[in-house]
Amino acid sequence: MPAGVPMSTYLKMFAASLLAMCAGAEVVHRYYRPDLTIPEIPPKRGELKTELLGLKERKHKPQVSQQEELK
């Protein structure tokens, strides 16, 4: 095996790394909870709003890009 590591140690590290990666992906997926509903009419440009579960109210005004100000 690479760098003289025994096969059993290599497989243990591989399994631990794979388990940690899958657990991390599950935590992120549960935290952000994607909206999997498909709207009938797509939202107009600038209408789609997303928020994190922990942020229910905005503490500041959303920033408007310079391109949207020119319209």
UniProtKB/Swiss-Prot annotation:
A single Pfam family, by name?
DUF4516
GO CC aspect terms: mitochondrial inner membrane; mitochondrion
**Induction data:** Up-regulated in response to glucose, serum, fatty acid starvation and AMPK activation using 5-aminoimidizole-4-carboxamide-1-beta- D-riboside.
GO BP terms: mitochondrial cytochrome c oxidase assembly; mitochondrial respiratory chain complex III assembly
InterPro entries referenced in this protein's UniProt entry, alphabetically: BRAWNIN (IPR027858)
Q: How would you summarize the oligomeric state and partners of this protein?
A: Interacts with UQCRC1. Interacts with UQCRQ. Interacts with UQCC5. Forms a complex, named COMB/coordinator of mitochondrial CYTB biogenesis, composed of UQCC1, UQCC2, UQCC4, UQCC5 and UQCC6; stabilizes nascent cytochrome b/MT-CYB and promotes its membrane insertion. Forms a complex, named COMA, composed of UQCC1, UQCC2 and UQCC4; activates MT-CYB translation. Forms a complex, named COMC, composed of UQCC1, UQCC2; UQCC3 and UQCC4; mediates MT-CYB hemylation and association with the first nuclear-encoded complex III subunit UQCRQ. Interacts with MT-CYB.
**What does the similarity note say?**
Belongs to the UQCC6 family.
- This one is known as Ubiquinol-cytochrome c reductase complex assembly factor 6
Q: List the source organism.
A: Homo sapiens (Human)
